């Protein structure tokens, strides 16, 4: 007779009528019983010939490509002028005094961030914008180009001007000013003595000694382009490369040093005029010497493709006869002035040799599942996560559920801050630009790649007879609709462009690490500045807690002003006030403990409604199901061990079939969720120990012992002893000398025992006691007459490695009757 859900729960000792634990529990460790139950629940059947189910409700396989939906009316989000202040350490020290070593180290990591992989693959610019939406290729191209242009205007991207120069918008950092054309003048060295930094050939005019400010950075740059003789920065821009800021021979280096920062900023303003006139002119620096500045030819971006006969593909249509009603010349003739072929930034800097290639592709998706009106740029730098160009990213601690509960479970009032475009706050060194390139090859190449006529363009590119090969009804209609949106920018976006990241991009594994370091250091500073409050962050999610709503509001004002003074942009509209139940990282955290948020509970209910019975489900779909159920597993009776059959099928890449009993068992598990409570400090009075043949307990002054029917593996025996100690004493702090029991991971034990032990030991805290000092060691070996003295073992709850580098205030047990506004610092609390 198949096992019913009720009998199964009884077997797992989840119901009250179970017999004595010392008899019932060891049976669950029996291998034969585990096999029989698995067969009864259909958990270990071999693969069957029934076709697999590849979709359960909204869940499809992790690797199945769900077609993204393109929205032709996507709005490109606006980005504020984000400029994180360079003297962030000084500003923090003004607030709290000297920073700790940990805080300083974290803040130095991101000023500027550095990314120098050993090897980088370069792809043709055709692959810059991914053809994710074949039906809307042209529309997607212009939307993506507009997004990139918006990021460039906001100072998030560099624009490659030549192989060795790039322009950008926004305020320059000091390391960029050192690399700025014109900021540091060249000077002749008549004796041909080279600065220490340069290894290249001796030439009369030389750059400043250290181009990057730090010698170590030159090593990075030199290594990133091995195989080419000489240092990159030591090469001099000849006149053919358009040198900026060249000073006449004979003038000493010291003349222009004082005015270097002012002259480079002044020059950036003057440069706009230079671009508009497209001519060479002279200006006088504050040292009185004439400084020569060369403008760019109009098609500097487009002219990189050798052999192009005509300056601009777009404007050629103006001089040609229309080939049909769908000819692009009709669109080009709509406007007299289409604007420049290329735009230049406010500042120009020298960069390492950067090819006209991309290292990752981009495409657009909905901003989030709840907002499909705005787009989000997805950058695919996956080359740095796989293959020969793989980079091993630094690891960082993510708070586990118990640590998070210990830290945040309290009766504080909470609010969460929203940092807008958090990743784009952290600046990247210009030397990282050649590794993080995005862009496009221009509209004609993109259209040619999408169309089947691309082979024609290879042979006769740029000639008049194939100009009209591009004309088609689809392209004409798309461009006419886009003309209403973008106007004369259609011309600008139709040209090729290569851009490199100036701020950290989201598609690189280094970025979450850097963001976590940055926000944790800031929260550490805030906690020390306001010791009567609690600040905590995970990535860009920052929460503030205070004893009362009034305190919280004044704290919010002070912290917001502090963050704004550092140049951090907050979204005041998205600030959420949670009251006493904090919503954070998918959890609801209150004084009673932690539970999953309601939308996750609803998803789980929906999942069980859609879950088919007696049908093999693809293991990739099982991954999705386990991902959802695993998030809420700590809140159920049996926890993760209940999901072990699913984990095993995923590990073996086999289909999984839910039997009615196993599905009903899981559903009852997730029907009632129990909060994970905050651990309390205390003294350990109960100890457990075991040998393969017997167990022993020390319950205060009392000693107990027992034997197993058959010898058991030592870890299993230790787990059983801990369960007996909990059920006999009811103590929630138990001392043990077994590391597996201490870890509270019961997934490697026999399945039935793991499920039962998880429920028995729920809410129990363990303290490590060495075997030699364990009072339960003698009883476990059958020696009841020997009494070792009970240890005074204190248990202190841990907050894990959650980047709490400053002293974190503990949480008051209750709200004070009256809040003293005079000086909240007098009631500062100490850490738990």
UniProtKB/Swiss-Prot annotation:
Q: What is its EC number?
A: 2.7.7.7, 2.7.7.49, 3.1.26.4
Out of the domains of life, which is the source?
Answer: Viruses
Site entry: Priming of reverse-transcription by covalently linking the first nucleotide of the (-)DNA: 63
* Reactions catalysed: DNA(n) + a 2'-deoxyribonucleoside 5'-triphosphate = DNA(n+1) + diphosphate; Endonucleolytic cleavage to 5'-phosphomonoester
Q: What InterPro entries would the database entry show?
A: DNA/RNA_pol_sf, DNApol_viral_C, DNApol_viral_N, HBV_DPOL, Rev_trsase/Diguanyl_cyclase, RT_dom, Viral_Replic_Matur_Polypro
Spans annotated as Spacer: 178-335
Q: List positions binding Mg(2+).
A: 418, 540-541
UniProt keyword list: DNA replication, DNA-binding, DNA-directed DNA polymerase, Endonuclease, Host-virus interaction, Hydrolase, Inhibition of host innate immune response by virus, Inhibition of host RLR pathway by virus, Magnesium, Metal-binding, Multifunctional enzyme, Nuclease, Nucleotidyltransferase, RNA-directed DNA polymerase, Transferase, Viral immunoevasion
Location of the region described as Terminal protein domain (TP) in the Swiss-Prot/TrEMBL record: 1-177
PANTHER family the UniProt entry points to = POL PROTEIN, RIBONUCLEASE H
Q: What is known of its domains?
A: Terminal protein domain (TP) is hepadnavirus-specific. Spacer domain is highly variable and separates the TP and RT domains. Polymerase/reverse-transcriptase domain (RT) and ribonuclease H domain (RH) are similar to retrovirus reverse transcriptase/RNase H. The polymerase/reverse transcriptase (RT) and ribonuclease H (RH) domains are structured in five subdomains: finger, palm, thumb, connection and RNase H. Within the palm subdomain, the 'primer grip' region is thought to be involved in the positioning of the primer terminus for accommodating the incoming nucleotide. The RH domain stabilizes the association of RT with primer-template.
| Its biological purpose | Multifunctional enzyme that converts the viral RNA genome into dsDNA in viral cytoplasmic capsids. This enzyme displays a DNA polymerase activity that can copy either DNA or RNA templates, and a ribonuclease H (RNase H) activity that cleaves the RNA strand of RNA-DNA heteroduplexes in a partially processive 3'- to 5'-endonucleasic mode. Neo-synthesized pregenomic RNA (pgRNA) are encapsidated together with the P protein, and reverse-transcribed inside the nucleocapsid.
Return the similarity comment: Belongs to the hepadnaviridae P protein family.
Extra notes?
Hepadnaviral virions contain probably just one P protein molecule per particle.
Q: What is this protein called?
A: Protein P
């Amino acid at each position: 007779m198949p096992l019913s859900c009720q009998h199964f729960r009884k077997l797992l000792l989840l119901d009250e009528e179970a017999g004595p634990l010392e008899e019932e529990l060891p049976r669950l460790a029996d291998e034969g019983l585990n096999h029989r139950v698995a067969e009864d629940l259909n958990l270990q059947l071999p693969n069957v010939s029934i076709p697999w189910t590849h979709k359960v409700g909204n869940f499809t396989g992790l690797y199945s490509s769900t077609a993204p939906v393109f929205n032709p009316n996507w709005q490109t989000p606006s980005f504020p002028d984000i400029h994180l202040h360079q003297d962030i350490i000084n500003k923090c020290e003004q607030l709290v005094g000297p920073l700790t070593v940990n805080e300083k180290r974290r803040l130095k990591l991101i000023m500027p961030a550095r990314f120098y992989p050993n090897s980088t693959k370069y792809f043709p610019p055709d692959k810059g914008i991914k053809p994710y939406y074949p039906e809307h290729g042209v529309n997607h191209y212009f939307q993506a180009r507009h997004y990139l242009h918006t990021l460039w205007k906001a100072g998030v991207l560099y624009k490659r001007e030549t192989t060795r120069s790039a322009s950008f918008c926004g305020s320059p950092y000091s390391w960029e000013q050192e690399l700025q054309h014109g900021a540091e003048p060249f000077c002749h060295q008549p004796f041909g003595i080279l600065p220490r930094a340069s290894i290249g050939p001796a030439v009369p005019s030389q750059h400043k000694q250290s181009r990057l400010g730090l010698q170590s950075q030159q090593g990075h740059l030199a290594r990133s382009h091995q195989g080419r003789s000489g240092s990159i920065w030591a090469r001099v821009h000849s006149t053919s490369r358009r040198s900026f800021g060249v000073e006449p021979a004979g003038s000493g280096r010291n003349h222009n040093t004082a005015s270097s920062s002012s002259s480079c900023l002044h020059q950036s303003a003057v440069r706009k005029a230079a671009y508009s006139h497209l001519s060479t002119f002279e200006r006088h620096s504050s040292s009185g010497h004439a400084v020569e500045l060369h403008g760019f030819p109009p098609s500097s971006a487009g002219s990189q493709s050798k052999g192009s006969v005509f300056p601009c593909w777009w404007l050629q249509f103006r001089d040609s006869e229309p080939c049909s009603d769908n000819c692009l010349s009709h669109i080009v003739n709509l406007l007299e002035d289409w604007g420049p072929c290329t735009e230049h930034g406010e500042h120009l800097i020298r960069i390492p040799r950067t090819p006209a290639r991309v290292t990752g592709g981009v495409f657009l998706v909905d901003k989030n599942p709840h907002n499909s009106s705005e787009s989000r740029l997805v950058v695919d730098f996956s080359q740095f996560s796989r293959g020969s160009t793989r980079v091993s990213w630094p690891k960082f601690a993510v708070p586990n559920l118990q640590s998070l509960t210990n830290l945040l479970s309290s009766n504080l009032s909470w609010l969460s801050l929203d940092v807008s475009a958090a990743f784009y706050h952290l600046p990247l060194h210009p030397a990282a630009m050649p590794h993080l390139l995005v862009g496009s090859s221009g509209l004609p190449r993109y259209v040619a790649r999408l169309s089947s006529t691309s082979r024609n363009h290879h042979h006769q590119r740029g000639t008049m007879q194939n100009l009209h090969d591009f004309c088609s009804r689809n392209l004409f209609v798309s461009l006419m609709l886009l003309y209403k949106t973008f106007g004369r920018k259609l011309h600008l976006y139709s040209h090729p462009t290569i851009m490199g990241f100036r701020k950290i991009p989201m598609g690189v594994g280094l970025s979450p690490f850097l963001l976590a370091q940055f926000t944790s250091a800031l929260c550490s500073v805030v906690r020390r500045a306001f010791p009567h409050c609690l600040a905590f962050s995970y990535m860009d999610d920052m929460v503030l807690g205070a004893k009362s709503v009034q305190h919280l509001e004044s704290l919010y004002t002070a912290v917001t002003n502090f963050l704004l003074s550092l140049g951090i942009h907050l979204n005041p509209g998205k600030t959420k006030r949670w009251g006493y139940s904090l919503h954070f990282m998918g959890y609801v955290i209150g004084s009673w403990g932690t539970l999953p948020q309601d939308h996750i509970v609803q998803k789980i209910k929906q999942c069980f409604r859609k879950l088919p019975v007696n049908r093999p489900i693809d293991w990739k779909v099982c991954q999705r199901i386990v991902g959802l159920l695993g998030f809420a597993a700590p809140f159920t009776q049996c926890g993760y061990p209940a999901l072990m059959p699913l984990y095993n099928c995923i590990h073996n890449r086999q289909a999984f079939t839910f039997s009615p009993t196993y599905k009903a068992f899981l559903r009852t598990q997730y029907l009632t969720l129990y909060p994970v409570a905050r651990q309390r400090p205390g003294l350990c009075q109960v100890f457990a120990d075991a040998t393969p043949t017997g167990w022993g307990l020390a319950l205060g002054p009392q000693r107990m012992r027992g034997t197993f029917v058959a010898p058991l593996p030592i870890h299993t025996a230790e787990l059983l002893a801990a369960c007996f100690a909990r059920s006999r004493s009811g103590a929630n702090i138990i001392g043990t000398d077994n590391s597996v029991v201490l870890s509270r991971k019961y997934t490697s034990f026999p399945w039935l025992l793991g499920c039962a032990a998880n429920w028995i030991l729920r809410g129990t805290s363990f303290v490590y006691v060495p075997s030699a000092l364990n009072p339960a060691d003698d009883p476990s070996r059958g020696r009841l007459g020997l009494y070792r003295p009970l240890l005074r073992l204190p248990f202190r709850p841990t907050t894990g490695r959650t980047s709490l580098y400053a002293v974190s205030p503990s949480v008051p047990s209750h709200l004070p009757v009256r809040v003293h506004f005079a000086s909240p610092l007098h009631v500062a609390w100490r850490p738990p």
